[in-house]
Amino acid sequence: MTKKVYVKTFGCQMNEYDSDKMVDVLGAAEGLVKTDTPEDADVILFNTCSVREKAQEKVFSDLGRVRELKEANPNLLIGVGGCVASQEGASIVARAPYVDLVFGPQTLHRLPQMIDQRRASGRPQVDITFPEIEKFDHLPPARIDGPSAFVSIMEGCSKYCSYCVVPYTRGEEVSRPLDDVLTEIAGLADQGVREVTLLGQNVNAYRGAMTLGATEIADFATLIEYVADIPGIERIRYTTSHPKEFTQRLIDTYAKVPKLVSHLHLPVQHGSDRILMAMKRGYTVLEYKSVIRKLRAIRPDLSLSTDMIVGFPGETEEDFDKMMQLVHDMSYDTSFSFIYSPRPGTPAANLQDDTPREVKLRRLQHLQATIEENVQRISQAMVGKVERILVERPARKDPNELAGRTENNRVVNFPAPVETHARLIGQMIDVKIVHAYPHSLRGELVMVHDTAPATH
């Protein structure tokens, strides 16, 4: 009987990527297949996030819910991976003794060995070391699930923002060699992938050796140029980037590489220089706006999303007003915005925070409502235009329709005869946008058209 693994993922796209790799590793070594039902699983893994307190506590809540499964089936293995595992280590087992495996983001490739050791010794296994980039040398070929794929190009972050736990849980920045990344992407393209998203905590800090052991270094702009030359790759995305290292070389890449989409996620975190300094972000609002101005001079239709933290210690009403002014000036398409959550061990956790929670909540609601107005306005402006989309899958609500994404990352659902679905999935097509919904668009097929850009 085939054994199964259930993985629940918290947090960022890096974690989504890592979760897929956990399934790949256990599939190759143990023959496990993925299940969406924990009750059916022989191995249950939680890939965790420690960026916010709520996500961290939810892990222990979920662990409590699977405890009864362990009691009913002592052979069931329960593991905790990701950033909470890296931060908490063996204390997870102390708090939840029924946990068998604790592993960090850099040691997920060791899961088969940890499982063997757990079975042989009868004791929980904990491995939260930072063996740099070793894990990529031990991962099996990726499973392809549609025409889009994530590719991790580096690990860790060396920025040490005052509020952020990532450098402590994922380690400092380490880049994969250029040829390793290109080989993986070429393999994906051979299997039908048309769009890749290059992943890292801070991708524009990428500095990869041209080949393993070489002294010549490729920066992020060079990597993008090489990826664009891989046959079959039609679109390039990346996340996440840092304003401090958004070089002129990278800006110029938007003029040189048409396959690089006109959509950018560039976290600003705040609109007040005073708060940015307290956050240790390393740039001013003016410097951030200068990057966007240069990019929009090259790509006037650039769609911009960001991350914002409301209620950072010491935030005044004037600081918040400056944030809202930045939102107005930048015309953000999307924002991942949250109330500040102090993380143990970070410098900001020691700052005095005297802003009432109800004030923080009011500010957050105002920010999110304003961003949502931007989203609706931008979506409505797309109605009547022809957009290039990559067809990804059948539509979730209607099997007679297909769904794809625009360059600015909006989902478009459109009708298509069922007999054409297999042919259209994975194709770049032009659709005319006929209606804008709150979080998606509706389109009509215009042309299957793989090379020339859509006409607006």
From Swiss-Prot:
Catalyses which reaction(s): N(6)-dimethylallyladenosine(37) in tRNA + (sulfur carrier)-SH + AH2 + 2 S-adenosyl-L-methionine = 2-methylsulfanyl-N(6)-dimethylallyladenosine(37) in tRNA + (sulfur carrier)-H + 5'-deoxyadenosine + L-methionine + A + S-adenosyl-L-homocysteine + 2 H(+)
Keywords: 4Fe-4S, Cytoplasm, Iron, Iron-sulfur, Metal-binding, S-adenosyl-L-methionine, Transferase, tRNA processing
Binding sites annotated in the UniProt record for [4Fe-4S] cluster 2: C157, C161, C164
Enzyme class per UniProt: transferase
NCBIfam families recorded: miaB-methiolase (TIGR01574), MiaB/RimO family radical SAM methylthiotransferase (TIGR00089)
Record's subunit section: Monomer.
UniProt cofactor note: Binds 2 [4Fe-4S] clusters. One cluster is coordinated with 3 cysteines and an exchangeable S-adenosyl-L-methionine.
Annotated MTTase N-terminal domain residues: 3-120
Domain TRAM: 380-447
Domain Radical SAM core stretches: 143-377
Name listed for the protein in its UniProt record: tRNA-2-methylthio-N(6)-dimethylallyladenosine synthase
Intracellular or extracellular location(s): Cytoplasm
The species this protein was found in: Paraburkholderia phymatum (strain DSM 17167 / CIP 108236 / LMG 21445 / STM815) (Burkholderia phymatum)
Protein family according to the UniProt entry: Belongs to the methylthiotransferase family. MiaB subfamily.
CDD domains to which the protein is assigned, alphabetical: Radical_SAM (cd01335)
InterPro entries per record: Elp3/MiaA/NifB-like_rSAM (IPR006638), Methylthiotransferase (IPR005839), Methylthiotransferase_CS (IPR020612), Methylthiotransferase_N (IPR013848), Methylthiotransferase_N_sf (IPR038135), MiaB_methiolase (IPR006463), rSAM (IPR007197), rSAM_horseshoe (IPR023404)
Cofactors (names): [4Fe-4S] cluster
Gene3D superfamilies from the UniProt entry: Methylthiotransferase, N-terminal domain, tm_1862 like domain
